[in-house]
Amino acid sequence: MEYQGIIFDFNGTLFFDNDKHVKAWNEISKILRGKEITLEELHTKLNGTPNIQNILYFTDGKATKEEQEKYSQKKEEYYRQFCKEDTKSFHLVDGVCEFFDYLKEKGIPFTIASASIKENIDFFIESFGLDRWIKPEDIIYDDGTYENKIAMFHKAADVIGVDMKDIRIYEDSNSGIRN
């Protein structure tokens, strides 16, 4: 089948960063519970779940809305800090730049649909120069209005002007695929 457009997930697909998320959640867990997360918690409670849900888990459901927002933002600040500190692996996956260049050269429309928040998307645009290939306003991110990742993919398809049946999606998360 010929694909006429492409949608990429970002984290875990174009940029390998899971270790930074784990470190950031460890910091939040230490603040809220006085201990780090366990591997079991990571795999059964935290991976692929929204920040707010994780914060409620750490606080036994007792975090106020203000605390949820505060610690969600704090987690992402830690995450960005850990990304910047790891200069060896703070880059797009090998071959991505060349593939993006190829897609641009061939006129194949593409964009990113990520569960990341706007602050992280802005960070990625600036750090990786994503605006060389994709207009920042065409990147779909978690602004709180999408029911699930599939809804984000549909919005991304609208943005690039290609019917979903003609799009190839690169997604690494089972939760992103199952939705």
Predicted features and spans:
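A general structural motif
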Residues: M1-Y3, G107, M164-D166
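N-terminal helical cap/lid subdomain that shapes the substrate entry/recognition surface
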Residues: Y3-D94, Y102, K106
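Alpha-helical segments flanking ligand/cofactor-binding loops in enzyme cores
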Residues: C97, D101, I177-R178
